[in-house]
Amino acid sequence: GEWAVLGLARYGYEDPEWYTAYYNNVVKYVQNIGSNKLHSRKLTDNSRVIIGLTAIGADPTNVGGYNLLEPLANLDDVVWQGINGPIYALIALDTGDYEIPELPDDSTATQTTREGLIQYILDKEIPGSGGWALWGTKADPDITTMAVQALAPYYNTNADVKAAVNRGMKAISDQQLSNGGMGSWGTVNSESCAQTVCALSDLGIDADTDPQYVKNM
């Protein structure tokens, strides 16, 4: 899967044969479905594959003749599944600093822009306490830190982003367990810890030394 590809590629693992096999599987899948839209509704599938392909240096604009970026041009489709959609679309677009394709002139859909994705994420911030969640009024560590990863490139240039990110990360610090662990959906897990470390790293914060995220040392 794409997360395995991303993790290994970012680590620097070198296995051209394995990466080529992954790429060929993606090409085969895209050509079999005959579409650059990898799921009928969930465009996070496109975003995830774009991230994976970019990690191995492949071109997501030409995968067996299909441009996987094109479906992300429709903001209405991107946000259909909720906040996950724009979070991962923004991450995917920024992994390769990709230009967002233009919608056809006769399209009635909303054109995706980076500004539109950012604003959608900001608008979904939990009022008062800060952070983000799929639903409810309490910040979820996974969704919050994923949102922060998407917004991090704009932290120093957009005051609204900076303020929202700061509120979100404070909410995460407040939820951190006494042993330093993190949990989501009532379960302490390594994935929530990893997402938090990724978010902190994107902000230039050392999770191993920053007093806001080091507990009982």
Residue ranges and their predicted role:
Residues 20-39, 72-77:
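Internal amphipathic alpha-helical repeat/solenoid segments
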Residues 1-16, 36-62, 78-110, 114, ...:
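An alpha-helical repeat/solenoid feature that recognizes helix-turn-helix modules
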Residues 59-73:
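Short linear, low-complexity motifs centered on an aromatic residue
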Residues 69-81, 171:
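Contiguous hydrophobic segments
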Residues 12, 17-21, 28, 119, ...:
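Intrinsically disordered, low-complexity N-terminal regions enriched in serine/proline/glycine
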Residues 22, 66-68, 214:
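Residue-level signal for alpha-helical context at structural boundaries
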